[in-house]
Each structure stands twice: as structure tokens, then as C-alpha cells.
């Protein structure tokens, strides 16, 4: 048994993972966890939002930082890489709409380039970070076989990347696309331009939450559970994930925006006010997460209640704070 454990530890330690966009909101939580599990990590990023949180002494020897762009990075970055987690992207709808051409260049063409180069350079496994936003507007709960209705540049680019990258899978190259719910939670590269994070910030700073489109539907997932999903895919048998798309989230975190605000207020401070506003946002969908649960046994550990409390406590403690870098579209404009 001890011999088997040592063989397993060696196998894990010998694996190298390239994370594109590794200094982003999710990547900066994911990479320390990968290092905790003894993976060697290469982080490819433009570092628009800084790199301090990935330059800590404890990461030395297990982490290589590569300041480059997925659109033209040299193929040498794939040397010795076993797995690619492709998170690099202009990261939401408002940012995507700032420059539609650049969004397609990066989120579609750039990530397809990374997938093709991964295959050409002998990488065994490639994971695309996609988004459930490609469902757009749905009357029924959307599963992986539902028709997609991407309504924005960001979601259209994600859909294009899925189509092109999944065509590359074969017996030697495992390709998986993960359609993530809207992610919330604390990160070293903090964002307050996502629904839950923004609501908690408003509650903390203004003691009221503004809700645009209270009937609009969305699925949500805590950032630590998003990281857990990547670890699940990394370790899954390839016959269960090759050429597959998985929605990532939990059925109990499908919320209308109005119900989401109520859940956050009830979790943190019931005396806070909720202001309902109109919206021109036509995105509205719930998603099913039965596939990832049934095939891979993936379940989430966090919900809106304990997740929003963690964000609020971090604001109280001062470990996170609001600044221009936490509003992605404002930082790019700046």
C-alpha cells in the first residue's frame, strides 16, 4: 500500500499544468490549490491586474510565470506540459462589448490556437473554461443538449471556441468544455462586477442592494467549487470526459435576481434594503447540473448563504476592498 501511495505521489508530482489566464479571478485561486496538490504549474497571463499574489516565496520552484498572450505566445510554453486549463479570456459581457473584434480574437481564435498547439505539442488533456451564459434566454432548465442562444459577443465567442476546440479530441488528446455558472467569492484578483459579489459589496458599503431585472434567472457557483470542478476534471478518466461538455454548478443555486438579493440579505443583515430597478438585459436561464453529478460525482460544498457571508467577512476584515481593478470593464477603460 505504501508503495502504491508513493507511486501515486510521484505521478502527481511529475505532472505539469499550464494555466492560461492564471492571474485572473479564478486562476489566482486555482493555482495555489494545484500547487497544494503537488502539481508543477506554468501560468500564462498578461498580468493586467498584477502578479503580486502569485509571486509569493511559497510558490517558488512549483510555479513559472509567463508574461505573454495566448494569441502569439511561443509554442515552447508547452514543453513538458501534461494538462492545459484554458482560462484566458476577456471575462464578461460588458468587457466583451468594449471591443467585439478583440473579444473574438482572444476568446475564440486565441483559445483555439492554444488548443491546437496543445495537441501538436503532445499535451494529453485540454480543458476549456466556457460559460453557461451561452444559453442566453431559456424557458426550460437548460442541459448540455439544449439549444444555445448566445446573445452577447462574450457568449458567442465562447460558443465558437467550444465548437472548434471539441473537434480536436481524439484518443491521444482529451478535450472538455466546462460551462460555468456565474462565479462568486473571494479571490486575490477580486472582482465586484459579478452579481453576488456586487450585491454583497453594496450591502456592506451602502446597506442596500440594487437589483436590475428581478425576474431574470441565473445559475451561480462559489469560486472554491469552481476550483473543485477543475480538480475533478483533471483527475477524471478520459473516457468519461473526452469530447464532453459539462454545466458546472448546482441545481439549488438557480436563482432569479430578486430571490438572490433576498437570500443575501437574509444571510447577512435582514435590515438592509432592496431596490428593484428595470433592465434591458435579456439573458435569463436556469441550468441543470445532473450530468456532472451523475458522470463525475461532482457536487458543490458552498451555497449563496455561506459564500456571501465569506465575502462580507473579508470586506469587514479588510482582506478585500473595492477599487478600480475590481471592476474589470472600468480597469480596461482606464
Question: Would you name each region that the model predicts?
Answer:
Residues 137, 151-176, 204:
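Active-site Tyr-X1-5-Lys
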Residues 96, 175-189, 198-221, 242, ...:
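A conserved pocket-lining segment of Rossmann-fold NAD(P)-dependent short-chain dehydrogenase/reductase
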Residues 112-153:
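Conserved Rossmann-fold NAD(P)-dependent oxidoreductase catalytic core, especially the SDR/UDP-sugar
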Residues 102-113, 148, 156-157:
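Glycine-rich NAD(P)-binding loop of the Rossmann-fold in SDR/ketoreductase-type enzymes
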Residues 70-106:
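NAD(P)H-binding glycine-rich loop region in Rossmannoid oxidoreductase-like domains
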Residues 207, 211-334:
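C-terminal substrate-binding subdomain of Rossmann-fold SDR/epimerase-dehydratase oxidoreductases
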Amino acid at each position: 500500500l505504501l508503495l502504491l501511495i508513493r507511486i501515486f505521489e510521484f505521478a502527481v508530482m511529475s505532472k505539469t499544468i499550464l494555466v492560461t489566464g492564471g492571474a485572473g479571478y479564478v486562476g489566482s485561486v486555482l493555482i495555489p490549490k494545484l500547487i497544494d496538490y503537488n502539481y508543477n504549474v506554468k501560468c500564462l497571463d498578461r498580468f493586467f491586474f498584477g502578479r503580486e499574489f502569485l509571486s509569493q516565496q511559497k510558490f517558488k520552484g512549483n510555479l513559472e510565470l509567463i508574461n505573454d498572450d495566448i494569441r502569439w505566445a511561443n509554442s515552447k510554453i508547452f514543453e513538458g506540459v501534461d494538462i492545459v486549463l484554458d482560462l484566458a479570456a476577456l471575462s464578461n459581457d460588458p468587457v466583451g462589448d468594449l471591443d467585439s473584434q478583440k473579444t473574438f480574437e482572444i476568446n475564440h481564435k486565441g483559445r483555439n490556437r492554444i488548443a491546437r498547439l496543445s495537441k501538436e505539442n503532445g499535451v494529453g488533456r485540454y480543458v476549456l473554461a466556457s460559460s453557461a451564459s451561452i444559453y442566453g434566454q431559456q424557458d426550460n432548465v437548460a442541459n448540455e443538449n439544449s439549444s444555445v442562444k448566445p446573445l452577447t459577443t462574450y457568449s458567442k465567442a465562447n460558443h465558437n471556441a467550444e465548437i472548434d476546440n471539441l473537434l480536436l479530441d481524439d484518443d491521444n488528446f482529451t478535450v472538455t468544455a466546462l460551462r460555468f455558472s456565474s462565479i462568486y467569492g473571494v479571490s486575490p484578483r477580486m472582482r465586484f462586477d459579478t452579481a453576488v459579489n456586487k450585491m454583497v459589496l453594496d450591502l456592506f458599503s451602502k446597506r442596500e442592494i440594487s437589483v436590475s431585472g428581478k425576474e431574470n434567472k441565473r445559475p451561480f457557483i462559489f469560486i472554491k467549487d469552481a476550483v473543485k470542478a477543475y480538480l475533478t476534471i483533471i483527475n477524471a478518466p478520459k473516457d468519461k470526459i473526452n469530447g464532453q461538455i459539462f454545466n458546472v454548478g448546482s441545481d439549488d443555486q438557480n436563482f432569479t435576481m430578486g430571490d438572490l438579493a433576498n437570500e443575501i440579505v437574509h444571510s447577512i443583515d435582514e435590515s438592509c434594503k432592496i431596490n428593484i430597478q428595470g433592465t434591458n438585459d435579456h439573458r435569463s436561464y436556469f441550468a441543470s447540473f445532473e450530468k456532472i453529478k451523475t458522470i463525475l460525482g461532482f457536487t458543490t460544498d458552498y451555497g449563496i448563504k455561506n459564500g456571501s457571508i465569506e465575502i462580507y467577512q473579508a470586506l469587514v476584515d479588510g482582506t478585500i476592498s473595492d477599487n478600480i481593478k475590481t471592476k474589470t470593464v472600468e480597469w480596461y477603460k482606464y
